[in-house]
């Protein structure tokens, strides 16, 4: 049975991915920081949960030595594009330095494992109409936000690990996705509101009744 490790397992994607992989017969483990969401995993008997930070290299080494994954999904990140303007340092630290820690630990302790880091459509920036639909082989990466820059850097770093060390790397660039457990502040409703203005208030006629 293949062993899977998911970083950022308590996020929206991580939760559903873990459940899907478990149903397909994989042994699943994941890591996340000490948040209330971590209790979701502790209550699930089919998960092994490691609590810690991808910035902690010693923690990562202990996880890899303990679990020895065959497949790694790297989802842990500062994952909000717009908010990256208010958290540039955190975005670059987690998404670049943290990712480098994950790649290096995987290279050292599970060199034959496949690693799938979550890249992003934010790496493209604004795409001219004449380049739509996007072709991942020819559309240039021109990120315009700290988040987009951090993800482009992470992707190039992953390619470097593949080219220089022969690591098995798959690089999906994820576009906007919504679903159960998505944080309310990131829903399509909020995006619609930002695009078209606030929702009209509902006006009612007050009626008094005597019972």
Report residues per predicted region.
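Conserved glycine-rich Rossmann-like NAD(P)H-binding loop of the short-chain dehydrogenase/reductase
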Residues: 26-35
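Active-site segment of SDR-like NAD(P)-dependent oxidoreductases
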Residues: 10, 78-82, 120-125, 131, ...
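NAD(P)H-binding glycine-rich loop region in Rossmannoid oxidoreductase-like domains
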Residues: 54-94
């Amino acid at each position: 049975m293949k062993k899977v490790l998911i970083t950022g397992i308590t996020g929206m994607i991580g939760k559903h991915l873990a459940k899907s992989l478990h149903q397909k017969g994989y042994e699943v483990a994941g890591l996340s920081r000490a948040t209330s969401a971590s209790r979701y995993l502790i209550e699930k008997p089919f998960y092994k949960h490691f609590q810690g930070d991808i910035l902690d290299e010693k923690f990562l080494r202990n996880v890899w030595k303990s679990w020895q994954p065959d497949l790694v999904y790297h989802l842990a990140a500062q994952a909000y594009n717009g908010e990256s303007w208010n958290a540039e340092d955190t975005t670059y630290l987690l998404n670049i330095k943290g990712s480098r820690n994950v790649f290096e630990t995987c290279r050292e302790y599970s060199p034959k494992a496949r690693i799938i880091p979550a890249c992003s459509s934010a790496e493209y920036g604004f795409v001219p109409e004449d380049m739509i639909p996007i072709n991942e082989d020819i559309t240039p990466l021109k990120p315009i936000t700290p988040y987009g820059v951090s993800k482009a850097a992470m992707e190039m770093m992953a390619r470097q690990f593949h080219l220089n060390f022969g690591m098995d790397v798959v690089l999906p660039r994820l576009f906007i996705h919504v679903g159960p457990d998505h944080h309310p502040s990131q829903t399509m409703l909020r995006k619609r509101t930002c695009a078209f203005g606030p929702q009209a208030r509902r006006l009612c006629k007050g009626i008094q009744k005597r019972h």
